[in-house]
């Protein structure tokens, strides 16, 4: 079965091309590229970790929807935070998106792109 690229490449801040697919389906698995708190205009959501976590999770939900998936289909999540002091605030907001139980997850500290406080990628399982 061929790999299906879902969505179109986006433009980031300053009109910079972002050369990756938002999602890729490989068989029954859907891989969502790392999402940050990027608004439609390519700018990062202003504000702290609360606003950026919500925007990032909403972006994940939107890309999942383009692939015919929901958060219920997510099997694994990888999270990068630029400041570990934000963990508990992030965690509370993150948990609200998974009221029926959260998927497997890893969370690490990482230097992220300018102004981004969080990045999230996911792997979903959704049989064709």
Regions found by a protein language model. Give the residues of each.
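N-terminal presequence-like segments and the immediate start of the first folded domain
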Residues: 1-58, 62-75, 81-128
């Amino acid at each position: 079965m061929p790999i299906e690229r879902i969505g179109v490449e986006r433009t980031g801040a300053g009109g910079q091309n972002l050369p990756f697919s938002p999602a890729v389906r490989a068989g029954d698995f859907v891989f969502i590229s790392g999402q940050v708190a990027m608004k439609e205009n390519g700018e990062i959501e202003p504000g702290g970790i609360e606003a950026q976590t919500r925007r990032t999770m909403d972006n994940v939900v939107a890309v999942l929807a383009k692939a015919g998936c929901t958060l219920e289909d997510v099997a694994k999540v990888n999270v990068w935070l630029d400041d570990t002091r934000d963990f508990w605030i992030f965690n509370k907001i993150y948990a609200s998106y998974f009221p029926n139980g959260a998927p497997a997850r890893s969370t690490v500290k990482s230097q992220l792109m300018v102004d981004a406080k969080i990045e999230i990628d996911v792997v979903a399982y959704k049989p064709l």
